[in-house]
């Protein structure tokens, strides 16, 4: 890349930094005064004219300054050399806050609240997908001699409880045998394999336990093949009102705050945006029209997966106006996702 291209990118970077910070269109004079670009005002004006002609910046109708376009933000994000990592104390504070969660629901709620506070944007976390989980443990509890409570615990920390009505009374010794049979078929297996294993268990079980096994297996298969991952925790929507001007259609940004709020109410829209994240090692940035959601054309979505040992439990991310602190937000999303995965995998 030529020195001219590098210089023009520095001008673009400075425009992005100033506009994100001030929300005011940026002029060449301000750039020269605020940034050590090492060139004259005339050169900066020429570079800005080039950036505008190429579609990286645009001129709002009401100002002589320029603002970044979606294309400009994309160029900026793609050329971020280093995302400033969080400090040791910041990382410890995040981990300690999440570790204080009493269960899966609490950990995810804490994660959303924390991410919304760190980024001052809308934060969203997807509940762990059962299809990507493994069975850590199955507990079988006798509520009465003819009624059982099955407690299924996955490696992502998800807990599902189901009631089984038995045809006959089950003695304590038989309960232990049933617990061993079901646990042996399920524990350590991915849920898809576990559902097959437990469905086949009836043919292999002792005759005196067959009815209890069939009834338990029926309930477990229903649990294992459900898809409760279509659940989200959302937080920080009040942050949208702080940035309401960004959704007013000014500066060439289409859409409105109302349209964004309506889109957030449709979980399928948010799940689609999180679906762009396929692993827990990469942060995905979708800017403006890249979201492919009409109501979200004035927004950016920064997301990644959370999980452990190479398994993605679900997605986590933030949504806000395209005018956002991309380096800081990327770092926050990555850190919170990492520690949510660590906390859940240790439970």
UniProtKB/Swiss-Prot annotation:
GO molecular function: DNA binding
Presence of keyword Transcription: yes
Domain of life: Bacteria
UniProt GO BP: negative regulation of DNA-templated transcription
Entry keyword Ubl conjugation: no
Keywords, ordered alphabetically: Repressor, Stress response, Transcription, Transcription regulation
Family as reported in the entry's similarity comment: Belongs to the HrcA family.
Role summary: Negative regulator of class I heat shock genes (grpE-dnaK-dnaJ and groELS operons). Prevents heat-shock induction of these operons.
HAMAP family in UniProt: HrcA
UniProt-recorded name of the protein: Heat-inducible transcription repressor HrcA
Organism of provenance: Rhodococcus erythropolis (strain PR4 / NBRC 100887)
Gene: hrcA
């Amino acid at each position: 890349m030529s020195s001219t291209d590098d210089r023009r990118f520095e001008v673009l970077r400075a425009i992005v930094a100033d506009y994100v910070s001030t929300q005011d269109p940026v002029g060449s004079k301000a750039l020269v005064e605020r940034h050590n670009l090492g060139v004259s005002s005339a050169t900066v004006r020429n570079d800005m004219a080039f950036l505008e002609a190429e579609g990286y910046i645009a001129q709002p109708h009401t100002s002589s300054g320029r603002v970044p376009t979606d294309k400009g933000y994309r160029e900026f994000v793609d050329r971020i050399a280093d995302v400033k990592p969080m400090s040791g104390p910041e990382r410890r504070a995040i981990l300690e806050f999440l570790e204080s969660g009493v269960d899966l629901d609490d950990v995810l709620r804490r994660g959303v609240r924390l991410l919304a506070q760190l980024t001052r944007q809308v934060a969203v976390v997807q509940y762990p997908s059962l299809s990507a989980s493994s069975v850590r443990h199955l507990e079988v509890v006798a509520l009465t001699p003819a009624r059982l409570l099955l407690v299924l615990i996955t490696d992502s920390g998800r807990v599902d409880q189901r009631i089984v009505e038995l045809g006959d009374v089950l003695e304590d010794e038989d309960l232990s045998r049933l617990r061993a049979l079901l646990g042996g078929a399920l524990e350590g297996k991915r849920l898809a394999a576990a559902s097959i294993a437990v469905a086949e268990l009836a043919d292999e079980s002792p005759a005196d336990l067959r009815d209890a096994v069939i009834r338990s297996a029926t309930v477990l298969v229903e649990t294992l093949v459900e898809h409760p991952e279509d659940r989200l925790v959302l937080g920080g929507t009040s942050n949208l009102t702080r940035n309401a001007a960004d959704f007013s259609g000014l500066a060439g940004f289409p859409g409105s705050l109302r349209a964004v709020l309506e889109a957030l109410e449709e979980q399928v829209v948010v799940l689609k945006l999180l679906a762009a994240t396929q692993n827990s090692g990469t942060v995905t940035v979708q800017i403006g029209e890249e979201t492919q959601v009409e109501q979200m054309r004035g927004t950016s979505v920064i997301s990644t997966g959370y999980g452990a040992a190479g398994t993605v439990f679900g997605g986590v991310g933030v949504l806000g106006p395209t005018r956002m602190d991309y380096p800081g937000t990327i770092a926050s999303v990555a850190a919170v996702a990492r520690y949510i995965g660590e906390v859940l995998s240790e439970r």
